[in-house]
Amino acid sequence: MSTTVIGPYEDDDPTEACSTIHHEVIGTTTCLSGGEDVPLAPLTTLKVGGPARHLVIATTHDELLATVRDCDRRGEPCLVLGGGSNVLVGDNGFDGTVVRVATSGLSAEVSSCGGALVTVAAGQVWDDFVVHAIEQEWIGPEFLSGIPGLVGSTPIQNVGAYGVEVGEFIARVRTWDRVDDTQRTFTADQCDFGYRSSRFKAEPDRYVVLDVTMQFNLGTRSLPVRYAELARRLGVEPGERVDTSQVRETVLAVRAGKGMVLNPNDHDTWSAGSFFTNPLVSPDQVPEGAPAFAQSDGRVKTSAAWLIDHAGYGKGFKVAEDAPASLSTKHVLALTNRGGASSGDFTTLARTVIDGVRDVYGITLVPEPRLIGCTI
């Protein structure tokens, strides 16, 4: 067995019974600075959001916990912000302290028979971790390539793509419980993972994720390809396994074609990704011709994108010709900032789409991003 330590992960002691120790940095470091009345728009992928009364950049677990606990003791509102890829912040900002999680580092115990048990700091950029996982021959994260945000956010939303969810790999999640003022570690079965849901999402202000431990098998061949569209792009049948690097390249190409890979020069990527979850409905609610995927509880998952498109809201739809927010020109499931959009522009667009789909199909779409200081 070998133990690998990457970056400044202060909660592991790399001197304990290690046969091999490596030190390196995953990805690049973004320079951020805190202060007073700091605009939050640059910290979100929608590029929307008013100022935080006070912004703290927490680069260590100690700094993160000290800031959160101090705010809680004083009764000051405190928002813990990850990569900003799944939030819509109101134009008035946040009247309190915003803590941007910027912790980093990774430790791994690897053995040929047991695979890799990998603990990653919450502030590590998710896609940088995916790149590293492929290099280390850890199987599974390749399907989740290109998803923006930080590792600590992935269990909250139980992020997923192309038939794979992060909850499949998670062994445990270490958190700070703000209600009980104590550290709590949850095993996978205690996380209540569901479709884009978890116990952490159910109580959004209670738990601060400190790190995530995941278990991976070893190899260069991917998990079986589950998603038909991806299998076609890979030139294989569903259920086949291919090189993990090939999966990543193809996933990135598919996501880029839908405007789902961040690009500062492409306004279609100024989004929160998929703005609505795919509805879970009874079989008799699925419109004729709509995709339908049976679930273990008897319900059916259908496509929010199909519903939006067939309700008359096509790519590039705006509520007005000069509106600065629109559906992506590449994919109707993303709401995008065309430049200068406010949170009000997004909530108006979202309400229009929700009401329209409900009027046509009787199905109410549910927004996926967390709403901070605004409502839909």
From Swiss-Prot:
Q: Which GO terms describe its biological process?
A: cell division; cell wall organization; peptidoglycan biosynthetic process; regulation of cell shape
InterPro entries assigned to the protein according to its UniProt record, in alphabetical order: FAD-bd_PCMH, FAD-bd_PCMH-like_sf, FAD-bd_PCMH_sub1, FAD-bd_PCMH_sub2, MurB, MurB_C, MurB_C_sf, Oxid_FAD_bind_N
User: What EC number(s) does the entry state?
Assistant: 1.3.1.98
**What Pfam families does the entry give?**
FAD_binding_4, MurB_C
Superkingdom of this entry's organism?
Answer: Bacteria
Give the GO cellular component terms, alphabetically.
cytosol
Q: Where along the chain is the active site annotated?
A: R196, S274, E368
- Give one GO molecular function term: UDP-N-acetylmuramate dehydrogenase activity
Q: Which cofactor does it need?
A: FAD
Any idea which UniProt keywords this protein has?
Cell cycle, Cell division, Cell shape, Cell wall biogenesis/degradation, Cytoplasm, FAD, Flavoprotein, NADP, Oxidoreductase, Peptidoglycan synthesis
* Location(s), subcellular: Cytoplasm
Pathway assignment reads: Cell wall biogenesis; peptidoglycan biosynthesis
Which catalytic reaction applies to this protein? UDP-N-acetyl-alpha-D-muramate + NADP(+) = UDP-N-acetyl-3-O-(1-carboxyvinyl)-alpha-D-glucosamine + NADPH + H(+)
Q: Residue limits of the FAD-binding PCMH-type domain?
A: 48-219
Outline what the protein does: Cell wall formation.
For this chain, the family text in UniProt reads: Belongs to the MurB family.
Classification via HAMAP family:
MurB (MF_00037)
NCBIfam families per UniProt: murB (TIGR00179), PRK13903.1 (NF010478)
| PANTHER family documented for this protein | UDP-N-ACETYLENOLPYRUVOYLGLUCOSAMINE REDUCTASE (PTHR21071:SF4)
Descriptive protein name: UDP-N-acetylenolpyruvoylglucosamine reductase
> Which source organism?
Cutibacterium acnes (strain DSM 16379 / KPA171202)
